[in-house]
Amino acid sequence: MAYYHCLLFDVDGTLLDFNASEKAALSEMFEHYGFDRREEMQRRYQEINASLWAALERGEIKQDKLVVQRFEMLFHEFDIQAKAAEVNEFYLAQLAARADVFEGVQDILQELAEVATLAVVTNGVERVQRKRLDQAGLTKYFDGFFVSSKVGATKPSRKIFDAALRELGVENREKVLMIGDSVKADIAGGKNAGLATCFCNFSGQDASTVKATHTIEHLHELMNIVMEPEELANVGNPEKRHQV
């Protein structure tokens, strides 16, 4: 029996390479609308976007306003006459078309799904996240999909975790692990909900001040945290997997 019975996953920066997807989607957007000063615009967009998502996590802005306002602010700075809502829809469509999966994710989820309940907990745009996970072939491994805009609560609020565990029928929080790359949203959020946490430090940053239960540098390390030795011994052997 796995040590953790329920695994809650963030999406961007944890399962999917958001940086690669964002860069490609922005490039398509710049090309489509013929925007100049692209490197400078991309840098400013990312700064504005990060500040607004931080505001979302603090409960200061709603997602539907955020996704348009980031382009309004960008176009104002660069004196661009363009419809922010229209550009945002084009950008989200390009982003949704990307399924940049971190190496080995599908195999890892397949093994973990045999020993635990898996679910997604994300602050991202629901239609974008669902399509990207579908295209990546990952949706089938999850028993639940919990997005902040639908639940009405944003990570790091414990309310989104409470809603997820309630719907999944999970009562013992000691057996739940929140897995993500955001110290503020995922690690602090998981702790707010009384959960063990796993910090995905895929960029190799200094994690000495991150107060997570576990820290990993590649997702495959998660199997050593979740699985018992007997289960680890049967990884890749479907005939013996259910004999443990």
Could you tell me what each predicted segment is?
Residues G104-V115:
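Catalytic-core regions built around general acid/base machinery
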Residues M1-L7, A20, Q110, V121, ...:
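Asp-based, Mg2+/Mn2+-dependent phosphohydrolase catalytic module
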Residues F35, I80, E114, V170-E171:
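Short, well-ordered coil loops that connect the C-terminus of an alpha-helix to the N-terminus
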